């Protein structure tokens, strides 16, 4: 008895190609595009809303951020206010930032502030210190005039400065 085996052969087919014929041109009728419709998912709306609120809040904060930064201690290790002479507008905030890690404070000299200003009310308490780099003390000066400042632990080393409020 003989056995017959056949192998499966796959022949690729090409649609639209005909032997011995020129290609046909497609129909020229154009269908109007179907109108696109989409909806915004609630989570996307929330994300956009949050981004807009954050942007607006950032703009408000930036516009109100009229602050001058004064470093307590120089980058070279000097015991100084950097800069030591500061000019600000009335109502502007001065931010004192510990730059070096030495303990510092900011005191206003009661004899060298504009008349009617309570130096104790705008100074740090003498026993309070900014010990770590990055710690800050802020004060907003509203009265025009010249204010003398000093760091009580380093006053003897010359750590003093002036703020002029215009």
UniProtKB/Swiss-Prot annotation:
It is found in: Plastid, Chloroplast thylakoid membrane. CDD domains: Plastocyanin. One of its GO terms (cellular component) is chloroplast thylakoid lumen. Keywords: Chloroplast, Copper, Electron transport, Membrane, Metal-binding, Plastid, Thylakoid, Transit peptide, Transport. Its main location: plastid. Its cofactor is Cu(2+). Residues 1-67 form a transit peptide. InterPro entries: BlueCu_1, Copper_blue_Plastocyanin, Cupredoxin, Plastocyanin. It is a peripheral membrane protein. Residues 68-166 form the Plastocyanin-like domain. It comes from the Eukaryota. Belongs to the plastocyanin family. This is Plastocyanin, chloroplastic. It comes from Fritillaria agrestis.
């Amino acid at each position: 008895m003989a056995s017959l085996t056949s192998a499966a052969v796959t022949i690729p087919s090409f649609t639209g190609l005909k032997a011995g014929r020129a290609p046909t041109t497609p129909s020229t009728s154009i269908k109007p595009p179907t109108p696109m419709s989409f909806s915004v998912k609630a989570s996307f709306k929330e994300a956009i809303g949050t981004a807009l609120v954050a942007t607006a809040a950032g703009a408000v904060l930036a516009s109100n951020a009229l602050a001058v930064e004064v470093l307590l201690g120089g980058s070279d290790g000097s015991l100084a206010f950097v800069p030591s002479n500061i000019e600000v507008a009335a109502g502007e905030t001065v931010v004192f930032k510990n730059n070096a890690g030495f303990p510092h404070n900011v005191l206003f000299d009661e004899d060298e502030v504009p008349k009617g200003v309570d130096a104790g009310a705008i100074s740090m308490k003498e026993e309070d210190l900014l010990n770590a780099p990055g710690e800050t003390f802020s004060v907003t000066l509203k009265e025009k005039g010249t204010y003398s400042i000093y760091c009580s632990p380093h006053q003897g080393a010359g750590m003093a400065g002036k703020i002029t409020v215009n």
